[in-house]
């Protein structure tokens, strides 16, 4: 673990102990997390006892992502853009196939993040496999996008009414309810509008907060969540910069060798046969 990762661990410990953080999230979907990055994030997360790793897979039937989630010891897997009963069935059946008898050891959730998914939600709850689903994540940014309204409307009354309706129906089915998308201190009134017991967690891009306690968090908690993501992005940048520098040195050496060799033979070989882009 490098110095920056140690600082990330200290920040996570602070967030867990003082601001009701219960997990960290990585996305194989929109974020495009690579396995090497996820493994480094797992190392950081594992250094803070009691924090779980959540993995958003690339689709409802992203089987390789599920196997990768097993390798990472993920506590939860989340399928994005599940909009129909059939897509939900595909996800649950894929999870049953991958996890087998160990399916009960992981929580499986789906993102309800479009208006089409909202309209189909009652039918989703009627599928025979619904008892295997543990919860839903209401994705507000994609939700407003699917409704043709701007990101700034994630805390609007229209989105709140829709979210409260989803939460009630999910809770009637015994499901956990999570809210994400555009989460900042400005979202606290939105979260406080949920009836008691209807909101289990809310999440930023990387940090997962547990309710109801986290609803009372001061603004500094959200600033620290942003700080963690900045540190994570810097750590990722540093990692790939080392690889890039390593290749750059090799490229420079090979180009010099190429030009020296070319000078020795260029009088005997047609120029058009040797074209090297700098």
Spans of features found by a protein language model:
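Expand to "…catalyze enediolate/carbanion chemistry for C-C bond making/breaking, isomerization
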Residues: 1-278
């Amino acid at each position: 673990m490098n110095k920056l990762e140690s600082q990330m661990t200290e920040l996570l410990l602070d967030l867990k102990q003082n601001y009701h953080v219960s997990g960290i999230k990585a996305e194989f979907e929109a974020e495009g997390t690579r396995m090497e990055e996820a493994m480094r994030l797992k190392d950081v997360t594992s250094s803070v006892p009691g924090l779980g790793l959540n993995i958003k897979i690339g689709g409802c039937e992203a089987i390789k992502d599920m196997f990768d989630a097993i390798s990472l010891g993920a506590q939860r897997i989340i399928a994005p853009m599940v909009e129909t009963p059939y897509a939900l069935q595909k996800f649950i059946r894929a999870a049953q196939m991958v996890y087998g008898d160990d399916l009960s050891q992981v929580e499986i959730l789906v993102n309800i993040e479009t208006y089409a998914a909202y309209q189909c939600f009652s039918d989703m709850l009627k599928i025979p496999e619904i008892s295997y689903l543990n919860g839903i994540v209401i994705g507000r940014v994609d939700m407003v996008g699917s409704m043709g309204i701007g990101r700034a409307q994630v805390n609007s009354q229209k989105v709140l009414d829709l979210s409260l309706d989803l939460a009630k129906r999910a809770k009637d089915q015994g499901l956990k309810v999570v809210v994400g998308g555009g989460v900042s201190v400005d979202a606290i009134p939105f979260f406080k509008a949920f009836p008691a017991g209807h909101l289990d967690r809310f999440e930023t891009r990387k940090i997962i907060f547990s309710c109801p306690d986290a609803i009372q968090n001061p603004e500094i908690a959200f600033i620290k969540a942003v700080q963690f993501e900045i540190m994570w992005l810097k750590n990722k940048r540093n990692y790939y910069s080392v690889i890039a520098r390593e290749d750059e040195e090799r490229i420079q050496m090979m180009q010099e060798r190429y030009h020296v060799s070319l000078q020795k033979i260029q009088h005997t070989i047609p120029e058009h046969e040797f074209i090297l882009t700098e």
